């Protein structure tokens, strides 16, 4: 009985002695780095501090001592320790240090040494802080991409408003986010606003189209002669004589395209009014476009060869509105295009006729230049021949006869 009580007391004493060490070891998170040691020479200049080495039996005891030590260099807590497994009994093998940052304590390889870093008390480096900021930014982006936290998106009428973060919460999150994340958020907001503007513009265009659809049936019952003749009179008044270019054939294609494009909205209007034929409303639109294109080409196309052309195609449009307006308008347009093509062919043939004349004039000038050059060369050769002959005669020695000598002797005697 006494032996049991003594053993129980010893066990309680051992448990009470080991409890603080185990709790200290559990509270300290460590990172083990084997076979490395601190470069003391370069670390001293960066602020590393340490205590005197002590002897401990195991590495766990050294970790516990580092966790409980908070008086390095006065008030610094231990956050880095080195345990030397090569030391024998009674020799100091546990080294406790305070390191300001990871960069301040560079490591170098060393066999038999184990280095431990306390993660709990170790200061955060720039890499860790940037990683933390990145995770915060990703959280902001994820929160911003949710429909409740999107400030630039407006819900249409009749739909429930999304619930989520308030405006103040979003503004506070934006203020804490990094600069590049703010730019990314702004880009998302603008991309969300663009579909809204497009839908708004489409909604504005729809009432205007409806208004035009309501206005067009009112003008359909009126006689088409008044609508078609008015722009034609204006054109004939402003174009006397009308000036057209060789490039008018291009406008004929645009007339056909405009005819095809203007036909579709008018047919939709006439579908609502079954009593009104679609051809009567189609004719003034086409003639109006043709008149506009004629005036536009006359005023803008001011370059090139201008020729006069009488105005045609007005009489066919003033016929009876009950019979084939679309066919008469198409025939007038085809007549115009045919006349324009004839004009283009005539202008092209005139330009082709002028081409040989210009080539003939060029060849005449060429031969004239060659003849002038040959005459100059000929005169140069003649001049050189005469000059050479004079030089030869001057250098050639004359042969004197007896009479010449006699005369010279007489003159000498005199």
Swiss-Prot record:
<keyword id="KW-1133">Transmembrane helix</keyword>
<feature type="domain" description="MANSC">
    <location>
        <begin position="32"/>
        <end position="116"/>
    </location>
</feature>
<feature type="topological domain" description="Extracellular">
    <location>
        <begin position="25"/>
        <end position="369"/>
    </location>
</feature>
<feature type="glycosylation site" description="N-linked (GlcNAc...) asparagine">
    <location>
        <position position="335"/>
    </location>
</feature>
<dbReference type="InterPro" id="IPR011106">
    <property type="entry name" value="MANSC_N"/>
</dbReference>
<dbReference type="InterPro" id="IPR013980">
    <property type="entry name" value="MANSC_dom"/>
</dbReference>
<feature type="region of interest" description="Disordered">
    <location>
        <begin position="311"/>
        <end position="339"/>
    </location>
</feature>
<keyword id="KW-0732">Signal</keyword>
<keyword id="KW-0472">Membrane</keyword>
<feature type="glycosylation site" description="N-linked (GlcNAc...) asparagine">
    <location>
        <position position="128"/>
    </location>
</feature>
<feature type="signal peptide">
    <location>
        <begin position="1"/>
        <end position="24"/>
    </location>
</feature>
<feature type="glycosylation site" description="N-linked (GlcNAc...) asparagine">
    <location>
        <position position="234"/>
    </location>
</feature>
<feature type="topological domain" description="Cytoplasmic">
    <location>
        <begin position="393"/>
        <end position="414"/>
    </location>
</feature>
<keyword id="KW-0325">Glycoprotein</keyword>
<keyword id="KW-0812">Transmembrane</keyword>
<feature type="compositionally biased region" description="Polar residues">
    <location>
        <begin position="326"/>
        <end position="338"/>
    </location>
</feature>
<dbReference type="GO" id="GO:0016020">
    <property type="term" value="C:membrane"/>
</dbReference>
<protein>
    <recommendedName>
        <fullName>MANSC domain-containing protein 1</fullName>
    </recommendedName>
</protein>
<dbReference type="Pfam" id="PF07502">
    <property type="entry name" value="MANEC"/>
</dbReference>
<feature type="transmembrane region" description="Helical">
    <location>
        <begin position="370"/>
        <end position="392"/>
    </location>
</feature>
